[in-house]
């Protein structure tokens, strides 16, 4: 038996074993058809009890995939004329996905080929197919900051709220990297502002966490939920407080955010501000009505944190606002005890004098 045909016979018999073997078989299939003719090839594989019709369908599919792959490549390279010719031939699947889940539309969106995208849309593709990473054409357009492509996709019915493998929407990605114009465009188009990613993070929490004040303001004005907590219990307010961003904290306080929500460690925004020495934020939170005496999981209050970190100015601010100096943590220690342990005598004296004055 001809060596090439024998190898081909074995390859086809084991197509199901793996994708690698399938690719080897396809390669040898082309070689055999070209070199020896289809009739001889069919006679060879009939030896293995393949039905001729099934085999012909298989061959047809191979050539079909080849055309679809060429179509995909033309879209990826921005070859407008070739894409148009292939579409007119009616021999390509506009929704064909390669091994990575890429469609012609996603491939064109990845590279920003608007003209190609326009041609593809005229052929009625599924605008919301996702690649192996969960990216849609819309998400891809957002990633390269192409508002014109986003506009084209949205006008033709693309879903704004698909999430990628990390749970991120087009809006979430735009917020993460600070694309204000894209975020604004997606908000105006009606995207869901409160979708949470795999970590429970919303666009607003993300904006606060990354210090994007202008985007946070957009989201707040558009009606984003101020009090959603991520998987760690963090709110947008806590996120902004932890990085010391007074501007975003002020936006959230003025918008009516809940000032007393606790994360999984029991920390409030006020506790974080006191612990990290953000006096202006402590003052903002106090003026906004934050509860002064909420303890964390270890029983520590904002006053205790400021006392043990030596921030006399914040201790004075909290005392003036009415913080309870007599609360004990889970180790039965007061703010004065904690200050004494680390040698902050001025704070100890201040707390002692307040206690003496209060009891007199």
UniProtKB/Swiss-Prot annotation:
GO terms for biological process: RNA processing. One of its GO terms (molecular function) is RNA nuclease activity. Keywords: ANK repeat, Repeat. ANK repeats lie at residues 100-129, 133-162, 166-195, 199-228, 232-261, 265-294, 298-327. PANTHER family: 2-5A-DEPENDENT RIBONUCLEASE (PTHR24141:SF1). This is Putative ankyrin repeat protein MM_0045. It comes from Methanosarcina mazei (strain ATCC BAA-159 / DSM 3647 / Goe1 / Go1 / JCM 11833 / OCM 88).
């Amino acid at each position: 038996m001809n060596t090439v045909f024998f190898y081909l016979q074995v390859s086809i018999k084991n197509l199901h074993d793996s994708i690698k073997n399938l690719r080897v078989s396809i390669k040898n299939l082309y070689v055999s058809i070209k070199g020896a003719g289809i009739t001889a090839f069919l006679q060879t594989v009939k030896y293995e009890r393949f039905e001729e019709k099934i085999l012909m369908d298989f061959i047809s599919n191979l050539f079909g995939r080849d055309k679809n792959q060429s179509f995909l490549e033309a879209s990826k390279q921005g070859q407008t004329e070739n894409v148009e010719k292939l579409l007119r031939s009616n021999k390509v699947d506009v929704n064909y996905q390669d091994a990575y889940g890429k469609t012609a539309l996603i491939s064109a969106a990845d590279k920003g080929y608007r003209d190609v995208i326009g041609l593809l849309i005229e052929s009625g593709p599924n605008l919301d197919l996702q690649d192996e990473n969960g990216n849609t054409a819309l998400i891809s357009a957002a990633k390269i900051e192409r508002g014109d492509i986003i506009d084209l996709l949205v006008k033709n019915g693309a879903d704004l709220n698909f999430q990628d493998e990390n749970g991120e929407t087009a809006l979430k990605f735009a917020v993460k990297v600070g694309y204000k114009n894209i975020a604004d465009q997606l908000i105006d188009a009606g995207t869901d502002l409160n979708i949470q990613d795999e970590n429970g993070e919303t666009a607003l929490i993300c904006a606060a966490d990354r210090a994007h004040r202008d985007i946070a303001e957009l989201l707040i004005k558009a009606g984003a939920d101020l009090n959603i907590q991520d998987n760690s219990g963090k709110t947008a307010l806590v996120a902004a407080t932890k990085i010391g961003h007074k501007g975003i904290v002020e936006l959230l306080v003025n918008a009516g955010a809940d000032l007393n929500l606790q994360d999984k460690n029991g920390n409030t925004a006020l506790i974080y501000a006191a612990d990290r020495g953000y006096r202006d934020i402590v003052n903002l939170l106090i003026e906004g009505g934050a509860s002064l005496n909420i303890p964390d999981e270890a029983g520590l209050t904002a006053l205790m944190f400021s006392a043990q970190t030596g921030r006399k100015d914040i201790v004075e601010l909290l005392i003036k606002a009415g913080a309870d100096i007599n609360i004990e943590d889970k180790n039965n220690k007061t703010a004065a005890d904690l200050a004494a342990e680390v040698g902050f005598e001025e704070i100890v004296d201040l707390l002692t004098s307040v206690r003496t004055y209060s009891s007199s």
